[in-house]
Design a protein with these regions (language model features):
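Extended, helix-rich architectural segments
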Residues: 1-98
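Structured, contiguous alpha/beta core segments that scaffold functional sites
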Residues: 17-21, 30-34, 46-49, 75, ...
Length: 208
C-alpha cells in the first residue's frame, strides 16, 4: 500500500532539476566542455561579434522584437489600480535612460542565454536636485528607478543557487583585473533567461 503523504512531506522539495545546475556554474550540464562556464560566454560573444552571418541574424531578430509596442495595464478596473498604472508609467519615463534603451540591451541575452541587470533606485525629490539619487521630473517623494544597469554576461562568475529549491538568489560578478567581486541579489535585479530547462540558471543561447 502506498503511504499517504503528510502535508509537510507534500510541500517539501526532494529532487533537483539537473545534474549540476545547483552549483551555480554557467551551463553546468552542457555536454561540450568548451561550452561550459565562462568559456561558453566567450565563445558566444566571439560568434556574435566576429561572424558576420550570426551578427546579421541577431541584429535582425533584435530589431523585430524592439518594434513591439509595450503598454502598462492596470491590475483591474478600480481607480486605485489606474492610479498605480500611471505611477508605473511615470517611473519608466523618469530613468537616466529610455525604456527602449533597456530593451535593446536586454535582447542581448538571447545570444548568451541569460541577461542580468541591477535596478538602482532613487527618491523622487525634484528636477533641481543634482544628486542622481534624488533627481526626478516629479516631486512626490516616492521611490523611483534611477537606472536599470546592465551587468554583462562575461562578468558573471557564477549564480548563487539555493541547494534545495534551485531558486536563483543572486550572482557573483568579477570586477576588473584586480580579482575583486560583487554580489548582486535577485531582489535588486532584473533577470532574464531564454529557458528554464533542467533548472539551468544560465538558460540556453539561441546560438547553441
Amino acid at each position: 500500500m502506498v503511504k499517504k503523504l503528510s502535508e509537510a512531506e507534500a510541500k517539501s522539495t526532494l529532487g533537483v532539476a539537473g545534474d549540476n545546475t545547483n552549483n551555480g556554474q554557467i551551463r553546468a550540464d552542457e555536454f561540450l566542455p568548451e561550452l561550459r562556464g565562462r568559456k561558453a560566454i566567450r565563445k558566444y560573444r566571439e560568434m556574435r561579434d566576429n561572424d558576420s552571418t550570426v551578427g546579421a541574424v541577431m541584429y535582425a531578430v533584435e530589431q523585430i522584437l524592439r518594434d513591439v509596442d509595450l503598454h502598462v495595464k492596470p491590475a483591474n478596473e478600480s481607480d486605485a489600480a489606474k492610479v498605480e498604472k500611471e505611477f508605473v508609467e511615470s517611473v519608466l519615463d523618469d530613468m537616466e535612460h529610455t525604456l527602449d534603451d533597456h530593451i535593446s540591451e536586454a535582447l542581448g541575452y538571447l545570444s548568451y542565454g541569460f541577461g542580468w541587470f541591477e535596478v538602482v533606485y532613487k527618491r523622487r525629490v525634484g528636477p533641481t536636485e543634482r544628486s542622481p539619487k534624488k533627481h526626478s521630473k516629479y516631486t512626490d517623494g516616492r521611490l523611483g528607478i534611477q537606472k536599470i544597469a546592465s551587468r554583462a554576461p562575461w562578468t558573471v562568475n557564477k549564480f548563487d543557487v539555493d541547494d534545495k529549491t534551485g531558486e536563483v538568489l543572486g550572482v557573483q560578478q568579477s570586477v576588473g583585473h584586480m580579482g575583486g567581486s560583487n554580489y548582486i541579489p535577485t531582489n535588486k535585479s532584473l533577470y532574464y533567461r531564454t529557458t528554464s530547462l533542467n533548472g539551468d540558471p544560465s538558460g540556453r543561447s539561441i546560438l547553441r
